[in-house]
Design a protein with these regions (language model features):
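Aromatic pocket-lining residues of Rossmann-like dinucleotide-binding sites
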Residues: 369
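Alpha-helical transmembrane segments of multi-pass membrane proteins
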Residues: 1-293, 305-307, 318-320, 343-353, ...
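Soluble small-group transferase modules, centered on the S-adenosyl donor enzyme superfamily
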Residues: 258-322, 327-328, 334, 340-346, ...
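Short, conserved active-site loop motifs that form the nucleotide-linked donor/cofactor pocket
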Residues: 400-402
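Short alpha-helix immediately C-terminal to the canonical SAM-binding loop
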Residues: 388
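Short acidic active-site motifs
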Residues: 411
């Protein structure tokens, strides 16, 4: 071990090391969720994977750091590991998205079930475990370097843990509310990599302490001569040993100085390169027609357009969340099917109709209803104000349509107004929020409907089986609240529109209102909906005790929407890649390259 550096004489620096290490761990964890979300969603399942892999890395780092500190208690090695962690974190914005795409490609062809889970887990292990393993070595190492008296060891360890915890708290809030919304995920990684790098550089630029040989105490020269000679002989021998050790230490310091200079130089070079090459916030780097790509507090956001349409996506790999037809015609998507709800509520018989949309998105449904119906008053609720901004800018959402920045359920709790139609179209990435899928929520919706009012729910993940998956669970839950339920599948998509009301005659009301519809395009669409509408009869339990009870009703206490959604996503992915799997089985890599025209 080389000599002690002056900076270590002050425990404040060691406490700050613990502080910034704790802060960086949490910042990387939150950055991980934002890096993975555009590809795998930000569901509770993905969060569980992120937290689990990070805890594994930290535990292994704690074990290794403690053993390494006992075996060779050299602070140079600890701060060298911090430099290595900083380098790795700085490279995440540069290569992370390519690693995710590569892992996803491999998993698609090698995993038949739970694709998102396995792909997200593999991506976390490859990208995040190593730097967090290194940061996990910090705490046990610092305990070794800061505890110099067992009498106050508890106080010292307590201070270290306090600084780590405070750093973790700050590392939780700063990325979420400051850096990610302001500068994006990529630069957030670079900021915290830079902090770790600067912390280590300060250490390595600190000089070593000087240890002088001192002088003889007064009176030592008055000792008796014989004893003095003996002492002098021993002194000469010890002096020789000291000189030998000093020479050895000087050589070690020289060797370490060269190694440390190389570490610092490598860290600075990689960090500078990463700052120039990793600043891009583009997750869909292969897309060429994007008019906007960015991040909000809640979502990854991507807007692209072609000659006919404008699209919004909150996920790189799966689906489109909103579509706007530039020519003003119907989209052919679920919005058109959902326009049956105003007819069911008697839009042609009323002077005006009040509509609430929970999950406004870019406002396609609101825009269409305003365009095709007279006297309709639409209000929207959208939790992500950046999506509302994009809706006004790119999707021509009228300024006359109010949009409230609120959680859908919280909004219903806060208002007393009632509506003729309530559209429920709220999603967190590709899964419905659990708090908007329970019997308690749908009961709340019913309480905000006028007599004869209609709720329409957009279900975006219709599976192959009619009696399992998220759409089945939602249908069972809704039918436990509303006595009249109808459903219709959206042609060519995995969407299903589900209509519910206390009015048993909504089909008759719809038919009567369609008689006065003059728009041929809309009338043709409503005829298609009418022909494909099916009454939904809930499945009930059979047997003792629970006979007659509706099965599978989701509650606030138990609403496994993520797991149910994952089952359907597996089916959708299997359908999408089956064609390419067949090509791979028959023609291998060459066949795939030819299929993609490489």
């Amino acid at each position: 071990m080389s000599g002690k550096r002056k900076i270590l004489s002050n425990k404040i620096y060691l406490y700050l090391t613990e502080f910034f290490a704790g802060m960086s761990v949490m910042a990387v964890e939150l950055g991980a969720s934002r890096l993975l979300a555009p590809y795998f969603s930000s569901s509770q399942i993905v969060w569980t994977i992120i937290i689990g892999t990070i805890m594994i890395a930290m535990a292994l780092g704690n074990i290794y750091g403690g053993r390494a500190a006992d075996k060779r208690p050299d602070p140079d090695r600890l701060y060298g590991r911090i430099i290595l962690a900083a380098i790795w974190i700085a490279l995440i914005p540069v290569i992370g998205k390519y690693v995710i795409i590569g892992i996803s490609a491999v998993m698609i062809f090698s995993v038949n079930h739970m694709f998102l889970i396995w792909a997200a887990f593999a991506a976390c292990m490859v990208i995040f475990v190593f730097p967090l393993f290194l940061l996990g070595t910090v705490t046990p190492s610092l305990v070794k370097f800061t505890v110099d008296d067992l009498g106050d060891s508890g106080k010292t360890v307590g201070m270290l843990n306090a600084f780590n915890t405070i750093g973790s708290i700050i590392g939780t809030f700063v990325p979420t509310f400051l850096t990610i919304p302001a500068v994006g995920t990529s630069i957030t990684f670079l900021i915290f990599a830079g902090i770790l790098l600067l912390l280590a550089i300060l250490y390595f630029f600190s000089p070593y302490e000087d240890h002088g040989s001192g002088s003889a105490r007064p009176g030592d020269g008055n000792k008796e001569q014989g004893r003095g000679r003996t002492s002098q002989g021993v002194s000469d021998e010890n002096s020789g040993n000291v000189n030998e050790k000093t020479g050895s230490n000087d050589k070690e310091k020289g060797s370490n100085k060269g190694k440390n200079a190389a570490k610092i130089t490598a860290g600075i070079i990689v960090f500078i390169v990463a700052c120039f090459t990793g600043r891009s916030d583009s997750f869909a780097f292969w897309e060429k027609d994007l008019v906007f790509e960015g991040e909000s507090v809640y979502n990854y956001l991507q807007v692209r357009e072609d000659d006919k349409r404008t699209y919004l996506s909150t996920n790189v790999l799966f689906g489109v969340q909103s579509v706007y037809e530039k020519d003003g015609k119907l989209t052919g998507m679920y919005y058109d099917y959902a326009m049956a709800a105003p007819y069911m509520a008697g839009v042609k018989e009323k002077d005006g109709l009040d509509m609430l949309i929970l999950g406004m998105g870019t406002g396609t449904y609101a825009t269409q209803c305003n365009r095709f119906f007279d006297g309709i008053r639409v209000e929207g609720v959208e939790i992500d104000e950046d999506i509302t901004r994009l809706a006004r800018e790119y999707f021509h959402l009228s300024d006359e349509i109010p949009v409230y920045t609120y959680d859908g359920r919280a909004y219903l709790n806060a208002v007393k107004e009632t509506y003729d139609v309530i559209m429920v179209d709220a999603y967190q990435d590709i899964t419905i929020p659990f708090q908007m899928s329970s019997v308690e929520f749908f009961t709340m919706v019913k309480e905000h409907l006028n007599p004869g009012g209609v709720m329409v729910v957009n279900m975006n993940m219709r599976g192959q089986s009619e009696k399992q998956g998220i759409t089945y669970a939602l249908a069972q839950t809704i039918s436990s609240v509303f006595p009249t339920c109808y459903q219709v599948n959206v042609r060519g998509t995995s969407n299903r529109e589900f209509f519910a009301s206390e009015n048993a005659e909504i089909l008759e009301t719809m038919a009567k209102n369609l008689e006065s519809e003059e728009n041929g395009e809309l009338l043709a669409m409503m005829q298609r909906v009418t022909e494909n509408l099916e009454a939904y009869t809930p499945v009930r339990s059979v047997g003792n005790g629970e006979a007659g009870k509706i099965d599978g009703v989701m509650t606030d206490d138990q609403a496994p929407v993520e797991l149910l959604g994952m089952q359907v996503i597996d089916e959708l992915i299997a359908d999408e890649v089956s064609y390419y799997k067949k090509i791979y089985q028959e023609g291998g890599i060459k066949g795939l390259l030819e299929a993609f025209e490489f």
